[in-house]
Amino acid sequence: MKDDVLKRQAHTAIQKKLGYAFRDMSLLRRALTHRSHHAKHNERFEFVGDSILNYTVARMLFDAFPKLTEGELSRLRASLVNEGVLAEMAAEMNVGDGLYLGAGELKSSGFRRPSILADAMEAMFAAVSFDADFNTAEKVVRHLFAERVRRADFQNQAKDGKTALQEALQARRFALPKYRIEEQIGHADDSMFVISCDLGELGFVCRAKGTSRKAAEQEAAKEALKWLEEKLPLKKKKK
């Protein structure tokens, strides 16, 4: 009984942060239900929410940065729409307090797991569209991402770690890096990946962890780039 009251309070607070009040609360509850808790979980909602999120942020960037190319806009969107940003946003909204998790996830602090929080955010965008319509869901995304888009700095954020490393190696005329899965820990839906980044002829290999293969590769690439720029800095051209 006490848990139900706390969940309702959490859901009320989450709606205030979203800037949207649900008419059908079952949709919000579904969006916050992890597969470990119930057969009616949020994974199908994530599928729709991901599309709403990507379209809306893409349109926001398209309007805000009229001079950027398609590739530049894609990289900038990747810096804003990713597990890390969504998990950070969910933490700011205390989404973890409103999640429905199975016993195993509760014991392992799943309410703080970035992948679970990020998935819940996407699922909530879908829930809003089902409760109202696409335009309302788009308004919610715009509300949440407005400040992040306003602060977006293409020069510093647009290039993800792998792209930046690739360009740095090409500028020095070295071969592209090779990424390899060294270890995968945990279950299929909530794994921790250990990825190695091998710079080949340079003789440097580093490892990094992430809640997805993509996230781990990005972290490994950033570590390799840091090493490369320290060991082989490019000479600045004389004016």
From Swiss-Prot:
Q: What class of enzyme is it?
A: hydrolase
Query: Which residues belong to any copy of the RNase III domain?
Result: 11-133
Task: Give one GO molecular function term.
Answer: ribonuclease III activity
Record organism: Neisseria gonorrhoeae (strain ATCC 700825 / FA 1090)
User: What does the record give as cofactor?
Assistant: Mg(2+)
Where along this sequence does the record place binding of Mg(2+)?
Answer: E46, D119, E122
Domain DRBM, by residue range, is 160-230
- Alphabetically list the UniProt keywords: Cytoplasm, Endonuclease, Hydrolase, Magnesium, Metal-binding, mRNA processing, Nuclease, RNA-binding, rRNA processing, rRNA-binding, tRNA processing
Query: What name has this protein been given in UniProt?
Result: Ribonuclease 3
Q: Which InterPro entries match?
A: dsRBD_dom, RNase_III, RNase_III_dom, RNase_III_sf
- NCBIfam families recorded: RNaseIII
Described by its record, this protein's role is as follows: Digests double-stranded RNA. Involved in the processing of primary rRNA transcript to yield the immediate precursors to the large and small rRNAs (23S and 16S). Processes some mRNAs, and tRNAs when they are encoded in the rRNA operon. Processes pre-crRNA and tracrRNA of type II CRISPR loci if present in the organism.
The family this protein is said to belong to? Belongs to the ribonuclease III family.
